[in-house]
Amino acid sequence: MKRWPVFPRSLRQLVMLAFLLILLPLLVLAWQAWQSLNALSDQAALVNRTTLIDARRSEAMTNAALEMERSYRQYCVLDDPTLAKVYQSQRKRYSEMLDAHAGVLPDDKLYQALRQDLNNLAQLQCNNSGPDAAAAARLEAFASANTEMVQATRTVVFSRGQQLQREIAERGQYFGWQSLVLFLVSLVMVLLFTRMIIGPVKNIERMINRLGEGRSLGNSVSFSGPSELRSVGQRILWLSERLSWLESQRHQFLRHLSHELKTPLASMREGTELLADQVVGPLTPEQKEVVSILDSSSRNLQKLIEQLLDYNRKQADSAVELDNVELAPLVETVVSAHSLPARAKMMHTDVDLKATACLAEPMLLMSVLDNLYSNAVHYGAESGNICLRSSLHGARVYIDVINTGTPIPQEERAMIFEPFFQGSHQRKGAVKGSGLGLSIARDCIRRMQGELYLVDESGQDVCFRIELPSSKNTK
């Protein structure tokens, strides 16, 4: 990941910056929404206020027009000068309201028509206790124009409401698109900052996985990202170097220990053989028994040293190259190698290979099968059964080694693959177990990208399962 000049140096700074930048579009959207809401609120208040004023003025003008006509007719009937003054006062008041209402009317012709009719009604003209014919016509024209004014005012008020609704809808659509854009911007920033944080974490995870697989990290690992994660990466590098050093010291110690034990052991074996051959003189039956015990113990010690060396060598070996391995020849070889002890215990072996091949290293797989089958023979019940079977499950091949006998206690199952662990059920035979066989077998299987574990099979006492990658020829 490329480091920017302004890249946050710490994880806290990066997280705070991420929160701020992600919240920024939302804050901008909230601020604009607040501004727009205020503007729409003010506009709605203005529309309501002007609408109320215009509607009341229109109603007042209608009432004034009716009062003018009533005063006009009363004057013609009573010929009272006071009524003439009232009429002129009403006419003046209507004229003032008409001037104020002129900006509301959508058409200036309507205003001019009302103004002309109002001017024509300036003089009172009566005939036979009523307006003369011309005056009556002017009053009727004025009333008709006033009605048109009221209708025009209503149209204007309605158009204002529609305009406000359109603006609200346009603002809503605008904020909808803006919300979508800002959401996408926030999403991009979330993904960007997630990558900035997860990237170094993934690198650390890969380093830990390599450590768990027993591979060295080397000194070529580069770190980027916040200082806390870089510090963790450096500590993991230090841990890798420390583990490599400890591993080398362990291998060296085991080599030296095995070498130092071999020399006195060889002398012990040679002396025991000389005593057993009675080279130094005849032995009594009691002495022969002691010599036999010494010989058996020295052989057990020699086997333990050889297993230690084998375990050490396989731990230090590099990654193996997997190849297509036919299972039938390996199984046949393993069964034949242990046919005598199996026959001595009158044990029967069944072979059922539904999966005929897998990806493995032939010698390592044979070593594992030999160990598991040997355990089945020596730990199994006399006159019991052993079953070697294989099956295909997706891209994996299962190889089961099953025997009848005493089941492994539940409390020991998590420990049987640990080096030097020996369970409560002891091995039957001339050679005592060392506790390294299953540990070596599991390490070998893991080096072949597989797994070895104990499973519970219905009707079976003990079942060890090998899981390996399947080959293209597996059926």
Swiss-Prot record:
Its main location: membrane. Autophosphorylated. It is a multi-pass membrane protein. It is found in: Cell inner membrane. GO terms for cellular component: plasma membrane. Pfam families: HAMP, HATPase_c, HisKA. Residues 35-173 are periplasmic. Residues 256-472 form the Histidine kinase domain. It catalyses: ATP + protein L-histidine = ADP + protein N-phospho-L-histidine. The keyword 4Fe-4S does not apply. InterPro entries: HAMP_dom (IPR003660), HATPase_C_sf (IPR036890), His_kinase_dom (IPR005467), HisK_dim/P_dom (IPR003661), HisK_dim/P_sf (IPR036097), Light-responsive_reg (IPR052545), Sig_transdc_His_kin-like_C (IPR004358). One of its GO terms (biological process) is osmosensory signaling via phosphorelay pathway. SUPFAM superfamilies: ATPase domain of HSP90 chaperone/DNA topoisomerase II/histidine kinase, Homodimeric domain of signal transducing histidine kinase. The modification Phosphohistidine is found at H259. It is an enzyme of class 2 (transferase). The chain crosses the membrane at residues 14-34, 174-194. Its EC number is 2.7.13.3. Residues 1-13, 195-475 are cytoplasmic. Keywords: ATP-binding, Cell inner membrane, Cell membrane, Kinase, Membrane, Nucleotide-binding, Phosphoprotein, Transferase, Transmembrane, Transmembrane helix, Two-component regulatory system. SMART domains: HATPase_c, HisKA. Member of the two-component regulatory system QseF/QseE involved in the regulation of virulence and metabolism in EHEC. Required for pedestal formation in host epithelial cells during infection. Autophosphorylates in response to epinephrine, sulfate or phosphate and then probably transfers its phosphate group to QseF. This is Sensor histidine kinase QseE. It comes from Escherichia coli O157:H7. The lineage of its organism: Bacteria, Pseudomonadati, Pseudomonadota, Gammaproteobacteria, Enterobacterales.
